[in-house]
Amino acid sequence: MMRKHPYEILLDRKRKWSPVKPTVGVIRDEARATIGRALAARHLELPVGAFITEGLEKDVPDNARKLLIDNVKDEERHDLALGYYADAFGTNENDEKEGKLLRDAWINHPDHTITKALVAERSIFFVLLPFFRFNGCAALRTISAYISRDEQIHVGANSLVCRELGLRPSPSLDKLRKATINWIVKPLGINTKDRYLDKKFWTDASDRLMYEGKAPEFSETQRARMPAFFEHSNVNLPKYA
């Protein structure tokens, strides 16, 4: 029996789901402004998909193409799910404007598109999703859990592609990554009693994910309480394909 390629293994791990329009539950006051900014960062979801699509037109390994094409569909699903939640949560005009300016900065950055996708997913999305898990309502925690499962596969795929092609992020892309995460968590405090409301906790996590590819401080995410079914209105439960 032939061993499956890592790209095939990642593809086999996927589980389709469909976003639904949620109802917003109780949100911690201290986290509300940052959640608003993090939701504005959803404008990066479709560009990340476009980065992958553009990469497919270049020198991406042939055996990665099926997985990457499917990953683009995931990004469209994530954009829809977060858009539904943002509509229910309420958007801030200034946050939306800044989110789109950051989106444009990522689009216009000259690094390879797969590199940009990897950095955005590993060092931005991998920070925002745990933030939603620790500070969001039941609906937002559920959305973040489903997106997180997809993003683990995306980061695995993009890491393999970058390794095969010898791609590394430039210092200017790292600077853009820092500017992005710093803007999102700016409303949080410093040296707070609750570390999940501490700005430095989240910026440090982004740095470690960027430079080390891991953030041990997120080990609690695996044990973070997931919403029980009885906590939800049925409209908050994703639909499976």
Regions found by a protein language model. Give the residues of each.
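Non-heme di-metal
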Residues: 1-241
